């Protein structure tokens, strides 16, 4: 693995812990260069990529696809419902097959935590693995686009007061972000229902009531309530959650003028955030979506650099 002039070389991208700080900053800066139109794009038509999504996705799936097509890669169609998965084929055997067919990169989202371990450790699978989200584990590409969005706004991470709010236990976005933001020097706070908070998060920040910290925040990162990962026993209503933990109009008015609001989406309007605030002046939710394409271009380029030994 290496970084030269913001050009990164990676074998796989499965978690934020696996990246050095230099690689993280290199990917962010390279994404910014793609966004500014400063990168001359090489011909990658011979490079094959398959997006293997076993959970529903709009932003991650389609922004990877846009990124791949902007880079000129050949994108292989894959529909889990129309594949041998419906006949009981395992993820491992699916990826083994794609690799045997000559696929260079597999971008994968799967409901199982750490699904990627047996794939990257396999002596037979030669395709590089990019983790598009594993269960409640990690979401490295979302984390990197979040970092780009923050860096565009403030030009730094050191000393920023950032709150990550909501469904913390079930959020792969929260886990990826808290680990790297702590490493980059941000001051982290967490809030949300106590039953969705783990003491393991104390290693990264402070659990606090939203109304105690909101006036001091630079970044408020809201998380989607992930109903699909709950057991059906919730102790709150939609309205109750919004009033207790959501970004209401009243709380929005207490934010600093320079503060920004983030959300990985999809948004549960009037739950995590008031409907009228999704596109408010302090909101950067649409910017996050746009930045996803450029960061994912940087990720795909980094994998190709690693495979082709370009650096």
Curated annotation (Swiss-Prot):
Superkingdom, natural source: Bacteria
GO cellular component: cytosol
Top class in the EC scheme: transferase
Record's keyword terms, sorted: Pyrimidine biosynthesis, Transferase
One Gene Ontology term of the molecular function aspect: aspartate carbamoyltransferase activity
Pathway: Pyrimidine metabolism; UMP biosynthesis via de novo pathway; (S)-dihydroorotate from bicarbonate: step 2/3
EC numbers for this chain: 2.1.3.2
Binding site for L-aspartate: 87, 172, 224
Coiled coil ranges: none
Catalysis: reaction(s): carbamoyl phosphate + L-aspartate = N-carbamoyl-L-aspartate + phosphate + H(+)
Listed GO biological process terms: 'de novo' pyrimidine nucleobase biosynthetic process; 'de novo' UMP biosynthetic process; amino acid metabolic process
Keyword Magnesium: no
Binding annotation for carbamoyl phosphate: 59-60, 109, 139, 142, 265-266
Matches recorded under InterPro entries: Asp/Orn_carbamoyltranf_P-bd (IPR006132), Asp/Orn_carbamoylTrfase (IPR006130), Asp/Orn_carbamoylTrfase_sf (IPR036901), Asp_carbamoyltransf (IPR002082), Asp_carbamoyltransf_Asp/Orn-bd (IPR006131)
Protein purpose: Catalyzes the condensation of carbamoyl phosphate and aspartate to form carbamoyl aspartate and inorganic phosphate, the committed step in the de novo pyrimidine nucleotide biosynthesis pathway.
PANTHER family: ASPARTATE CARBAMOYLTRANSFERASE, ORNITHINE CARBAMOYLTRANSFERASE, MITOCHONDRIAL
Family membership: Belongs to the aspartate/ornithine carbamoyltransferase superfamily. ATCase family.
Subunit note: Heterododecamer (2C3:3R2) of six catalytic PyrB chains organized as two trimers (C3), and six regulatory PyrI chains organized as three dimers (R2).
Protein name: Aspartate carbamoyltransferase catalytic subunit
Organism whose genome encodes this protein: Streptococcus pyogenes serotype M18 (strain MGAS8232)
